[in-house]
């Protein structure tokens, strides 16, 4: 696929997801937009300047941390957009617009999943921070989307390599990426960071009135 076609496909993916997000969430407060922007910027910095590349296109980084963190602090749509925008932009700045297409989708999935588990299943915002099982629920919410990425990353990577890059790439190679463990290590490390940051930041952000109250999308 030509570079122009990659850019057009990326534009279509971005417009579709942003449009769907607006329809789903409908309103974003100024504070939510600001915090989402901060998380997107942190995702970009964490990936672009603090990553360790590996053979085969994999790399160790903590960019996904801020995708899941935004989802827990705000909601799934905000978290998904923070990671999708921040990390897709990081791919573009790194000269990989083809990767940015699948990155945008993958990070949005992480955010939506973490947000759904945190706010729909566990209703973290309504829980007492000192209640029994609170820490376990925070860990599970953070891990949900990040561990799902262990499987969605190679799956979408297969379609990217075959249909966007036109490479010789097999399902077996995609499964090898799972077995390689780099994405899993990323997910575990990011989960630990998310839990620590969430427990530290939530009380302060609540006192500052920067977090939404009640049930969220």
Please tell me what each predicted stretch does.
Residues 1-217:
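Loop-helix junctions at membrane interfaces
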């Amino acid at each position: 696929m030509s570079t122009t076609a990659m850019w057009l496909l990326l534009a279509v993916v971005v417009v579709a997801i942003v449009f769907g997000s607006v329809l789903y969430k409908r309103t974003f407060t100024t504070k939510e937009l600001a915090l989402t922007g901060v998380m997107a910027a942190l995702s970009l910095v964490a990936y672009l300047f603090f990553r360790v590349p590996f053979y085969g296109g994999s790399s160790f980084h903590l960019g996904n941390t801020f995708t899941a963190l935004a989802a827990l602090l705000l909601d799934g749509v905000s978290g998904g957009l923070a990671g999708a925008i921040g990390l897709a932009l990081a791919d573009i700045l790194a000269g990989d617009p083809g990767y940015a297409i699948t990155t945008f989708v993958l990070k949005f999935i992480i955010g939506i999943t973490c947000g759904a588990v945190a706010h729909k299943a566990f209703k973290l915002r309504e829980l007492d921070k000192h209640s029994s099982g609170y820490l376990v629920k925070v860990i599970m919410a953070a891990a949900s989307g990040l561990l799902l990425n262990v499987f969605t990353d190679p799956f979408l990577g297969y379609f990217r390599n075959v249909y966007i890059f036109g490479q010789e790439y097999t399902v077996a190679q995609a499964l090898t990426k799972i077995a390689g463990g780099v994405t899993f290590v990323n997910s575990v490390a990011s989960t630990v960071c998310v839990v620590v940051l969430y427990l530290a930041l939530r009380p302060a952000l609540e006192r500052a009135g920067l977090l939404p109250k009640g049930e969220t999308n």
